[in-house]
From Swiss-Prot:
N-glycosylated. Residues 1-262 form the Peptidase A1 domain. The active site is at 35, 176. This is Cardosin-H. Disulfide bonds join 167-171. GO terms for cellular component: endoplasmic reticulum; extracellular region; membrane; protein storage vacuole. It holds the Pfam family Asp.
Amino acid sequence: DSGSAVVALTNDRDTSYFGEIGIGTPPQKFTVIFDTGSSVLWVPSSKAHSMYESSGSSTYKEQDFIEATDETDNVFLHRLFDGILGLSFQTISVPVWYNMLNQGLVKRFSFWLNRNVDEEEGGELVFGGLDPNHFRGDHTYVPVTYQYYWQFGIGDVLIGDKSTGFCAPGCQAFADSGTSLLSGPTAIVTQINHAIGANSEELNVFGLTPEQYILKGEATQCISGFTAMDATLLGPLWILGDVFMRPYHTVFDYGNLLVGFAEAA
């Protein structure tokens, strides 16, 4: 679309997708995950990553935020990205992208996530439109049911061609670009993992100390992309993370409060 801005994304082993932003004037560069499951902007200061220097920006006071100057944990130490930029609603906290919205620059944005980790182009985030090169056919749009996450209702969950009937009373889901896996209620995820042959019933259990299992290495096994999560506050809830968003080009339309899905190309 004319007037749109494209952010190239890097695919980190199908576990996260991140791109570059600039903060301040002149812009200081950071790599962040663009997260539709949160609203805050995190730019941690770490020796292993870029560090935001507030005195180096002439527009330091234009956006309200909290700056942490000391952190005991090392959450981002071994990550390839510097932080997280939230793209959800202001019900959580006022997100940075609302500045673009209030200036009339952006009414929607869209994601394409490449599953092929060997390709140079890891993905694409388009602010203000969508890229026709990365989807086929028309998008199917569903209304946002609650402006906290990009949340919408789903009518059923099928395993193969058979209905589970679990969502007959109604289920909620939200598309979350900051979550690697697809999370859902334990009762259904257990059935899904059993259907695809993922189980631990025949495995022995061996205990390990933190010193033994905290190490850096390549994975040698296949891991199910479905993870169980029972949400008590919102009822049956599905988090459609990158596992879902890779095969489906996803549009987040704030102007019409819709989420759209089309086959990714």
